[in-house]
Amino acid sequence: ASTKGPSVFPLAPCSRSTSESTAALGCLVKDYFPEPVTVSWNSGALTSGVHTFPAVLQSSGLYSLSSVVTVPSSNFGTQTYTCNVDHKPSNTKVDKTVERKCCVECPPCPAPPVAGPSVFLFPPKPKDTLMISRTPEVTCVVVDVSHEDPEVQFNWYVDGVEVHNAKTKPREEQFNSTFRVVSVLTVVHQDWLNGKEYKCKVSNKGLPAPIEKTISKTKGQPREPQVYTLPPSREEMTKNQVSLTCLVKGFYPSDISVEWESNGQPENNYKTTPPMLDSDGSFFLYSKLTVDKSRWQQGNVFSCSVMHEALHNHYTQKSLSLSPELQLEESCAEAQDGELDGLWTTITIFITLFLLSVCYSATITFFKVKWIFSSVVDLKQTIVPDYRNMIRQGA
């Protein structure tokens, strides 16, 4: 880094309190290069209570340091305290007087203003539009309605024609001290399925202009869903609870209802994924029912019920139970596992016995060889002639 003179900032305590007997005044010397820099107070006349900290090299490659002087609180405000900085490498001299500046307390911040009411429009539930016995409803929800302007006016239109059969529910106060207002319009099943357009117009004094929201059934050619049920996996049968799966694929639009039942009674312990877009533009989903393994093994029948506008009578059902084929397969699998376990046990025992027999044979052979070798050595020592006596006799 090239030579650079420092920037100097005087630091004063920010308090009106006079309870403290002393006050700490500071001087920040920043962004200079190279070292050193000299800091004094009142041109060197003030030395008592002065503490200058070592310089610190910053990531920028420049240095900074600070100096603090402690003075009596009674003197601060009546006497002048000046920080004198001298940086000889850059020929920079700076004098800064520390002035008493008391902080003014800020008033409490007001609560952030609400931007104004927001409007949301929700379609009827798929099951409600597909069953004559149920009542489909389009719901218009207005949130963030202020106490100052609580009155909300709803106007409903079906294909551009205003209707007057909607019902507005009482206002509900929310945690943020605003109101939530809901208006519900009952619709005709076939009107919704035929793609009629529903519009909710909301007027409120907190709005610069009325807000309009429009909704209708998704446009496009309906496609019939294909439904497949899947039994629990073999690996899961070792647990106390098992999963039955229902795959629904190839349907359009995404409005669909999936439920489970057993012996005519609804099953509630199931989870269904949201419809997901497939590569061909249709939708698919999975639904998983969790049941006790004992119920499955007892042969109970579980049914996956699907409702969609493209189905005949808007309804289909696929059942699932432990069939003899599945039971036989599970039994065979268990038997096969048992046979494999028995086979591994047999192989382990055989290998163990084989190794023991090899060790035993090797030990016996070792001792036999040792005994034979010892016998041969003893025999040789017995039959060796005494050639020395024979030579003496010949002489």
UniProtKB/Swiss-Prot annotation:
Region: CH1, residue numbers: 1-98
Topology Cytoplasmic: residue spans: 368-395
Stretches in topological domain Extracellular: 1-346
GO molecular function: antigen binding; immunoglobulin receptor binding
Keyword Transcription: no
Top-level taxon in the UniProt lineage: Eukaryota
GO biological process: adaptive immune response; antibacterial humoral response; B cell receptor signaling pathway; complement activation, classical pathway
Region described as CH3: 220-326
Ig-like domain mapped to chain residues: 6-99, 117-216, 225-321
Ranges that cross the membrane: 347-367
Region (Hinge): 99-110
PTM statement from Swiss-Prot or TrEMBL: Glycosylation on Asn-176 is required for interaction with Fc receptors and ability to activate the complement pathway.
Protein keywords: Adaptive immunity, Cell membrane, Disulfide bond, Glycoprotein, Immunity, Immunoglobulin, Immunoglobulin domain, Membrane, Secreted, Transmembrane, Transmembrane helix
Annotated glycosylation sites: N176
SUPFAM superfamilies registered for this protein in UniProt: Immunoglobulin (SSF48726)
GO cellular component: blood microparticle; extracellular exosome; extracellular region; extracellular space; IgG immunoglobulin complex; immunoglobulin complex, circulating; plasma membrane
InterPro entries noted in UniProt: Ig-like_dom (IPR007110), Ig-like_dom_sf (IPR036179), Ig-like_fold (IPR013783), Ig/MHC_CS (IPR003006), Ig_C1-set (IPR003597), Immune_Resp_Modulators (IPR050380)
Record has Protein biosynthesis as a keyword: no
Assembly description: Immunoglobulins are composed of two identical heavy chains and two identical light chains; disulfide-linked.
Protein name: Immunoglobulin heavy constant gamma 2
The species this protein was found in: Homo sapiens
Lineage: Eukaryota, Metazoa, Chordata, Craniata, Vertebrata
Gene label: IGHG2
